[in-house]
C-alpha cells in the first residue's frame, strides 16, 4: 500500500532511504516493487532522563532538537551527553548496516525517507535534514503507520508526508510493524536486508 502511494505521488528517479532499523525492510521492498534505488540512513534518538525523546541525529548531521524542550543550565551537560551517546550509537549502527560504505549519491534526486511506525518525528526530521545536506533535490517522508501528532509536526516542518495509516492514539498502532516480543529479531532481519539490497 505504501509503495503504491509513493508510486502515485512521486516521479522517478527515486532513492528510498530506510531509517534503521524499523524502516529498512519496508523501504527495501517498496524500492524493489518500484524499481527505485535503496539505501539505509542511520539515525538515533536523543533521550534525556526525565524528559524522554527530545530529538535525534542522522548520520553525521547536526542534532535536531524539539523546540519545546528548553533545557535549564544544569541540564546542558545531560543534553550534551545524550547527543554524544546518540552519535556513538549512529557510528556503531552504521558499521552493522552499511559496513565502511558511504550512503549512495543523492545528487538532485527525489529522496524518500521511510520508517515503519512513527510515534516521534525526530529521526525522520534529522534524516530529512541529512538528505538535504547530501544534495537531495526533493525530500519526502513516508511511513507505514504514523500518529496524527507526528503527521502534524512533519507538516509544520514543511516535509511532504506519505502514510496510508494515521492513528489518533499518541502511543501509535496497537500492533506496530516488527516483533515487539523480540526487537532483536527485527533488527537482525533489517541488517540482513540492508546488506543484501545495497
Positions of PLM-derived features:
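PRPP-associated nucleotide enzymes
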Residues: 1-198
Amino acid at each position: 500500500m505504501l509503495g503504491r502511494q509513493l508510486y502515485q505521488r512521486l516521479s522517478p528517479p527515486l532513492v528510498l532511504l530506510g531509517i534503521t532499523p524499523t524502516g529498512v525492510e519496508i523501504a527495501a521492498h517498496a524500492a524493489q516493487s518500484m524499481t527505485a534505488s535503496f539505501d539505509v540512513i542511520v539515525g538515533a534518538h536523543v533521550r534525556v532522563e526525565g524528559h524522554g525523546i527530545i530529538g535525534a541525529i542522522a548520520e553525521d548531521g547536526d542534532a535536531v532538537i524539539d523546540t519545546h524542550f528548553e533545557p535549564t543550565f544544569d541540564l546542558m551537560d545531560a543534553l550534551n551527553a545524550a547527543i554524544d551517546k546518540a552519535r556513538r550509537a549512529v557510528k556503531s549502527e552504521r558499521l552493522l548496516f552499511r559496513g565502511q560504505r558511504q550512503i549512495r549519491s543523492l545528487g538532485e534526486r527525489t529522496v524518500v525517507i521511510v520508517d515503519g511506525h512513527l510515534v516521534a518525528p525526530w529521526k525522520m526530521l534529522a534524516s530529512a535534514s541529512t538528505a538535504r545536506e547530501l544534495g537531495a533535490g526533493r525530500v519526502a517522508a513516508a511511513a507505514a503507520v504514523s500518529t496524527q501528532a507526528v503527521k502534524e509536526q512533519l507538516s509544520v516542518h514543511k516535509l511532504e508526508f506519505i502514510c496510508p495509516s494515521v492513528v489518533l492514539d499518541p502511543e501509535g498502532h496497537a500492533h506496530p510493524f516488527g516483533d515487539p516480543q523480540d526487537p532483536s529479531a527485527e533488527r537482525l532481519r533489517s541488517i540482513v536486508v540492508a546488506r543484501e539490497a545495497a
